Regions:
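Conserved functional hotspots at enzyme active or ligand-binding sites that engage polyanionic ligands
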Residues: 1-103
Length: 103
């Protein structure tokens, strides 16, 4: 199963960031593309940053997506699908990424 844009998956981000929920931000890849996905990680340890965007969803613990954590990883590190964010939440996170990157 290829992770889809707007879905939240448990992903293995390695020893430093561990396994945690992450929002899939990239479009699905095709057979000719590299099997990579771009994700934004979710945290429950908030610091009060303007780049921590809180999201309420039944499949997530209280916390926020950290738009400073844009990361591209191999799709095989997406372990299991948790659910899909609403279009409103997805737009809010996209806007946060634009602010962070000044796009």
């Amino acid at each position: 199963m290829i992770p889809q844009r707007g879905e939240v998956w448990m992903v293995d981000l390695g020893l430093a960031q561990k396994t945690r929920p992450a929002l899939i931000l990239s479009e699905p890849y095709s057979d000719k593309d590299r099997a990579l996905i771009t994700v934004i990680s979710h945290t429950t340890k908030l610091r009060g940053s303007k780049f921590e965007l809180p999201v309420s969803a039944p499949f997530l613990k209280p916390g926020a997506f950290v738009v400073q954590s844009v990361t591209t990883i191999p799709a095989k590190l997406a372990l299991r699908r948790l659910g899909t964010l609403s279009n409103d939440y997805l737009r809010m996170i996209e806007d946060g990424v634009r602010r962070w990157l000044r796009l």
